[in-house]
């Protein structure tokens, strides 16, 4: 995993965004999250437990605790009540992106380089739209996958432009769990050190 953190990238735009009502919700929620030091990952309206508005978010350093979920919920609830974008009752669910997270920013591909991802594209690339493989390189315009399943006649590596991406998600592996836990522990230690330094000033 790359040593790159999400700190300082809070205004980095998302590559994969919502459409329709979900887009309207994201437009309402995202400025509130930025204002309190969080980044929006995804918003979805789901037909589960009645109707559920699922909001995935994280701190700029990539962490998200239960207390953070409560803070986000309390910050966005009043704004949603005022804007009233949903014409029926719904349940608000705020969560972290999880270990097998959606990949929505360029920095996600840098941060999780070396891990397995599955993705879909909006256009054909090497005669396909669905890919699965290890992120071997992430650049400014796209990323390179080393496919773990190659059909006859296909190249092992494929470069996917970020502009062609329609969906991407990490695949849960033991290595991913280990690296995600290590990154979370490091981010929490850095936050504790920063809080300690702030207290001494």
Curated annotation (Swiss-Prot):
One of its GO terms (biological process) is translation. GO terms for cellular component: cytosol. Pfam families: DUF150_C, RimP_N. It comes from the Bacteria. Its main location: cytoplasm. Keywords: Cytoplasm, Ribosome biogenesis. It is found in: Cytoplasm. The keyword Cytoplasm applies. The keyword Cytoplasm applies. HAMAP family: RimP (MF_01077). Belongs to the RimP family. Required for maturation of 30S ribosomal subunits. NCBIfam families: PRK00092.2-5. This is Ribosome maturation factor RimP. It comes from Rhizobium leguminosarum bv. trifolii (strain WSM2304). The lineage of its organism: Bacteria, Pseudomonadati, Pseudomonadota, Alphaproteobacteria, Hyphomicrobiales.
